């Protein structure tokens, strides 16, 4: 353990870049880490972070916060994916948002955490004919980090959705635990599938009022699933997360809530990684 970051009686500390609503941070805290600080530019997400992680310091911009950040044992970050996603224009690391990776590495190079964990969409692997991923790996190496990468799917960690993300786990001059990213996720906890054999029908015009169908929705928003024997009544929409705390930042803005959750790192996946790393302290 790095003495400048933690003591023998303290929990290993984590600093979170591009923290979102704290998916990475939650998973690491569930494994026994303590979040020291979080950097997130979206004020809505920062409100959630402030509510859910009151013990952590919050900062807004990875480009300007370096002088305020304290040393930590682990830095985690799901850096922006918009410029490498197949749904975007794919400017890669030259893009304004995904290019913030270099600002993140400037922080890492200065703080020198023992471990670094990064996350992005699988599109990072083939962006710019694979050159962008080579640049990412080279940047880590130039800062003294060596490790592994692997694409992990959240559905194998008890989450009812297919969510493939590439994770890079690297140590400062040391490899992560042997076989770390060669292991499989807990495949015995494969999440149950949603019903796919129920009939579909056109939604009532009232349900479509003010609704815009996104370009990437697989099933038309004008269709709804009919549940055989179900009651023809409106029901309260369920959330994937609790409203308490979210409402303080989201103010009942459903779109903001969905976007924040959609951008978040899946906590069970983060926890699986964290449980491997905490054995090294």
Cite the ranges covered by each PLM segment.
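Class I SAM-dependent methyltransferase "Motif I" SAM/SAH-binding loop
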Residues: 17-21
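Short alpha-helix immediately C-terminal to the canonical SAM-binding loop
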Residues: 44-47
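Class I S-adenosyl-L-methionine
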Residues: 7, 64-74, 82-257
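Conserved SAM-binding motif I beta-strand of class I
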Residues: 35-40
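Conserved SAM-binding strand-loop segment of SAM-dependent methyltransferases
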Residues: 54-62
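A short, Lys/Arg-enriched amphipathic alpha-helix followed by its capping loop at the start of a domain
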Residues: 27-34, 52, 273
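Conserved beta-strand elements of the Class I
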Residues: 13-15
């Amino acid at each position: 353990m790095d003495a400048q970051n933690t003591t023998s009686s303290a929990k290993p500390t984590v600093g979170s870049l591009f923290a979102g609503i704290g998916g990475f941070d939650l998973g690491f805290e569930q494994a026994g880490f303590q979040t020291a600080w979080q950097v997130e530019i979206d004020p809505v997400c920062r409100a959630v972070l402030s509510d859910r992680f009151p013990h952590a310091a919050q900062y807004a911009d990875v480009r300007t916060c370096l002088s305020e950040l304290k040393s930590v044992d682990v830095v985690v970050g799901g850096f922006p994916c918009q410029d490498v996603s197949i749904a975007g224009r794919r400017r890669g690391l030259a893009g304004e948002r995904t290019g913030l990776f270099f600002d993140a590495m400037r922080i890492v190079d200065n703080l020198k955490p023992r471990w670094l964990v990064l996350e992005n969409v699988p599109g990072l692997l083939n962006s710019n004919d694979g050159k962008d991923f080579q640049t990412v790996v080279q940047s880590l190496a130039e800062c003294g980090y060596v490790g592994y990468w692997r694409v992990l799917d959240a559905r194998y960690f008890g989450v009812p959705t297919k969510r493939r993300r590439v994770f890079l786990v690297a140590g400062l001059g040391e490899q992560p635990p042997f076989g770390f990213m060669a292991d499989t996720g807990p495949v015995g906890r494969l999440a149950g599938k949603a019903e796919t054999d129920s009939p579909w029908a056109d939604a009532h015009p009232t349900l479509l009022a003010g609704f815009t169908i996104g370009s990437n929705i697989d099933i038309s928003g004008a269709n709804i699933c009919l549940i055989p024997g179900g009651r023809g009544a409106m029901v309260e929409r369920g959330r994937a997360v609790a409203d308490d705390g979210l409402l303080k930042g989201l103010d009942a803005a459903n779109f903001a809530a969905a976007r924040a959750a959609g951008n978040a790192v899946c906590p069970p996946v983060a926890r699986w990684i964290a449980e491997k790393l905490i054995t090294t302290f």
